[in-house]
Amino acid sequence: MRSLIIVLLFPSIIYSMSIRRCEKTEEETWGLKIGLCIIAKDFYPERTDCSVHLPTASEGLITEGNGFRDIRNTDKL
């Protein structure tokens, strides 16, 4: 029963999906891109010592908690 609920909920969390051929000459190879929106309740962040340089922006900060990683652009904070 639990697996049936997961199967029924999975399509509802996909907000975008596109399928295209990897190469126009190949008919059997396809690329798949799926966007997911994940909402985590009771997220408890912990500061890490990891700092990331984002080439399109300035610096980013990685925060971890409950198995999720959060990367933020410090220009917008």
From Swiss-Prot:
* Membrane-spanning residues: none
Q: Where in the sequence is the signal peptide annotated?
A: 1-17
Q: What is the superkingdom listed in this entry's lineage?
A: Viruses
Cross-referenced Pfam families: Pox_T4_N (PF04491)
Keywords, sorted A to Z:
Late protein, Signal
Which Gene3D superfamilies is this protein grouped with? 2.60.240.30
Does the record carry Transcription as a key word? Answer: no
Induction of the gene: Expressed in the late phase of the viral replicative cycle.
What family is it from? Belongs to the chordopoxvirinae B9 protein family.
Entry protein name: Protein OPG195
Q: Which organism is it from?
A: Vaccinia virus (strain Copenhagen) (VACV)
